[in-house]
């Protein structure tokens, strides 16, 4: 039989597995919310540890927290930050919308670990109380939103942005590699005028660069913290200067710039900065979806498709068709992007649900946001390393496309006019002939004139 200890809260005693640091409220949550498999993200757990450590420092400086107790809280919180106590955070996302159970999970774990460090008995709440000491000057209503913002900023800065920059670097390398390869452009999926393959890839690189810049643009708003607003934004039970001190301590702990939100009522009741930031992530997903689609279609074939690109062959593609290889990295990335579009819809709705002084969709917002960051970062790296860096041009196919294109007739607009050029192109298409044959045979140009005007290399920029 598993050994237990008795923990208590305002509802009375409850048994908790003896080797677990959580207490009564986390235990009740395990029983009350048996919903799904989605646990609190590790980045949120880490962020809760950061908040508790920063609050302990601020409380020792401003609220008279006993240094012995405060130092023990700081030490225990550091273990949470370092991921040493992650197994003691078992709660699911689907709980109270304020994240109260997860805040109390952190309070209880840090309390019991600090008690253990001080030689006390877990479950006694002495000498470190989860509410009176670990949660001192705080409410779940400002603590969980603060942890959300910390986690989101850290994951964007340390995971998503480096991944997108990695992809951007690889695309820029392809721009250089393909700069002299002239191909036919396509608009409305139909043949258009020429451009270089490098120019086409420069569009992809520019999209990723814009995505990076747009996400970075959202970080200042996301770096404003609710901590210090306590229950409804008034700062009740927090000392003067607590909000500013906590933001300062969080900045020191993370090495990132955080500030206290100028209006705590807004910080508790709305999460517009989360919606704004995820909107930029959603736009990045839209950009990567387009890029992945273009690349897989340009690589279609190998004999009956567009066949302009040769994509890396990473694994067998079919259980029934021998030798088949598929554009799996594009498929994985576009699935991720589609999922992010769904997350964005959920976040947008959740952001609108700040009823009066508190938004109560916090855990779901944090989970979806962080999932998007994780997935897009992972997928961008996978797509870069397993696809983009190995892309090669199939120059023979590209050349044939240029030679057969009817849209080269656009180069004759200035010489012959739109209507005659349209007639030449349509006649060539109908007869299965070339532009040269119809232009020269129809008496519009000589062979020499055709060669003078229809030069793809002169059609890839302003003249």
From Swiss-Prot:
SUPFAM superfamilies: L-aspartase-like (SSF48557). It catalyses: (S)-malate = fumarate + H2O. The active site is at 188 (proton donor/acceptor), 318. Substrate binds at residues 98-100, 129-132, 139-141, 187, 319, 324-326. The record marks 331 as: Important for catalytic activity. Pathway: Carbohydrate metabolism; tricarboxylic acid cycle; (S)-malate from fumarate: step 1/1. GO terms for cellular component: cytoplasm. One of its GO terms (biological process) is malate metabolic process. Keywords: Cytoplasm, Lyase, Tricarboxylic acid cycle. Its EC number is 4.2.1.2. It is found in: Cytoplasm. One of its GO terms (molecular function) is fumarate hydratase activity. Belongs to the class-II fumarase/aspartase family. Fumarase subfamily. There are 2 substrate-binding sites: the catalytic A site, and the non-catalytic B site that may play a role in the transfer of substrate or product between the active site and the solvent. Alternatively, the B site may bind allosteric effectors. Homotetramer. Involved in the TCA cycle. Catalyzes the stereospecific interconversion of fumarate to L-malate. This is Fumarate hydratase class II. The lineage of its organism: Bacteria, Pseudomonadati, Pseudomonadota, Alphaproteobacteria, Hyphomicrobiales. The gene is fumC.
